[in-house]
Amino acid sequence: MGVLARIQGPDDLRQLSHAEMTELADEIREFLVLKVAATGGHLGPNLGVVELTLALHRIFDSPQDAIIFDTGHQAYVHKILTGRQDQFDTLRKQGGLSGYPCRAESEHDWVESSHASAALSYADGLAKAFALTGQNRHVVAVVGDGALTGGMCWEALNNIAAGKDRSVVIVVNDNGRSYAPTIGGLADHLSALRTAPSYERALDSGRRMVKRLPWVGRTAYSVLHGMKAGLKDAVSPQVMFTDLGIKYLGPVDGHDEAAMESALRRAKAYGGPVIVHAVTRKGNGYAHAENDVADQMHATGVIDPVTGRGTKSSAPDWTSVFSAALIEQASRREDIVAITAAMAGPTGLAAFGEKFPDRIFDVGIAEQHAMTSAAGLALGGLHPVVAIYSTFLNRAFDQLLMDVALLKQPVTVVLDRAGVTGVDGASHNGVWDLSLLGIIPGIRVAAPRDADTLREELDEALLVDDGPTVVRFPKGAVPEAIPAVKRLDGMVDVLKASEGERGDVLLVAVGPFASLALEIAERLDKQGISVAVVDPRWVLPVADSLVKMADKYALVVTIEDGGLHGGIGSTVSAAMRAAGVHTSCRDMGVPQQFLDHASREAIHKELGLTAQDLSRKITGWVAGMGSVGVHVQEDASSASAQGEVAQG
């Protein structure tokens, strides 16, 4: 029996010898490669925190002591050590193990958001709560190096530093991609001394003694202290933390488990806020990850664990289509610049950066700053393109509203991973953007249905010079092109026309749900229901031509991949009412709830967003229509209560 098989919880770690700990680290890496290769997931980050996490659970008493992982995708080892190794075959599968910390899974998981830079604020609040309630408990926050580029971390550090007697240990997982190692043995020695309680006592005693000397004493103390501080500043970056009043320990080899234990033990004993700087290597111990120049296998799909290779789809994905289209436009227009929040590769801007290195700005994990910086670029005569995941727009909403839209600045925001994203769970679904964007005065929002309309709508967005524009698209492969039958007033695409001037049902499809709407229309046609399908292209604001067309039908059904409250359906309905159009409306989309992880297809099926379910509902609505002017929102919960969700 291997060592890993004997680990059922953190207590088991404390019984192991140093040799067994080394063996356990090797077994965990082998386990991670085999399991993540089979399911997909965040491989590189977890290979880099094996020894670090082992040391954490040897020194601290979880869950009595709170261990919080920022960017929770680096918590796989934590899950293995807290009794969940037998569930890794279900990682990121419906009903299985989450790819992030999950409070429903284990008492060892304190939080579950995977958005970066939040852990220190959680830690600050927990430490205050423990102090106020008289609980002698430690708080540990594991912060990925990239997270420290987010302003929220520094807001939290400012507050943590004020709690001199509150035990908060901040482990900076520095994998070398953002921070340079601290220089020299003197820096190591000073760091070790300044975190030792005995040194603090000696320093306090010396300070009092020197200051009690005649008038020269205070001056001598200031000079000596200044010399030491100046020398320290010259050789070490830790001054940024010590100047805040937070003790710094490091750098520590994050792959030396014994060294990590020693550092964490001293940090724990200090009794106040301490930073432990652990230098790690992303993908450590797996050659294919170590040699992956792009991102050390940060996130993978299903791969062969021996070769490290996965099966790539031959179909282009939305991100690559956007990337090529932006480069084409930027080749013609020198005013186009790009902004990424530490995600140039995932959002398709890496190729742009290679071609135009002086016209791309990586602002770190700082979406708020990205948006206002974009406003500044626009004020300076440029047209910035901010490419972020839809779920991260939440953080930049105030800046988009007040710093971009209020000033009517031409900033184009490209939202990747819009709609249901699936396996990464509740925190990564991009289902909030349309509800948020709908309240911004003057904003224009496009939702392309295929590659051709993505290129076209991006081009149109880049021509707007009097306010912000948004282009949103989902994760994954681009569907086949869907040609329009005709275009109304240069705005709305009619994908299927009904026979005659009037019809029964008008389906309004948002973005890639166009193909779903056409499939529904085919089913309804067979039942003798007259149907037309339109793609608004620009879903905000609602086009007058769409409202006029709605007046010719008995029922309008909107189908969208975002939240129903404040979504496109309710916006279309409001536009119809304002124009005096009394056609009945039904909205189909995502309920306002946090969706558990599963494949996109499984989630859509669970929500009733399938051709079978929707055609069945629409048939029932048409058959039962006895009134007009009714606006009804439908989601999974209400449909289930009425028995309308298909079970097959």
Swiss-Prot record:
Gene3D superfamilies: 3.40.50.920, 3.40.50.970
Record-listed Mg(2+) binding positions: D145, N175
Protein name per the record: 1-deoxy-D-xylulose-5-phosphate synthase
Subunit composition and interactions: Homodimer.
Record's keyword terms, sorted: Isoprene biosynthesis, Magnesium, Metal-binding, Thiamine biosynthesis, Thiamine pyrophosphate, Transferase
Manner of cofactor binding, per the entry note: Binds 1 Mg(2+) ion per subunit. Binds 1 thiamine pyrophosphate per subunit.
Cofactor: Mg(2+); thiamine diphosphate
Pathway(s) served: Metabolic intermediate biosynthesis; 1-deoxy-D-xylulose 5-phosphate biosynthesis; 1-deoxy-D-xylulose 5-phosphate from D-glyceraldehyde 3-phosphate and pyruvate: step 1/1
Class of the enzyme per the UniProt entry, highest EC level: transferase
UniProt-listed Enzyme Commission number(s): 2.2.1.7
Catalytic activity: D-glyceraldehyde 3-phosphate + pyruvate + H(+) = 1-deoxy-D-xylulose 5-phosphate + CO2
Record GO terms (molecular function): 1-deoxy-D-xylulose-5-phosphate synthase activity; magnesium ion binding; thiamine pyrophosphate binding
Gene giving rise to this polypeptide: dxs
UniProt binding sites for thiamine diphosphate: H73, S114, H115, A116, G146, A147, N175, Y286, E367
NCBIfam families named among the record's database cross-references: dxs, PRK05444.2-2
Cross-referenced HAMAP family: DXP_synth
SUPFAM superfamilies tied to this protein: Thiamin diphosphate-binding fold (THDP-binding), TK C-terminal domain-like
Family affiliation: Belongs to the transketolase family. DXPS subfamily.
Annotated function: Catalyzes the acyloin condensation reaction between C atoms 2 and 3 of pyruvate and glyceraldehyde 3-phosphate to yield 1-deoxy-D-xylulose-5-phosphate (DXP).
Cellular component GO terms, alphabetical: cytosol
GO BP term (any one): isopentenyl diphosphate biosynthetic process, methylerythritol 4-phosphate pathway
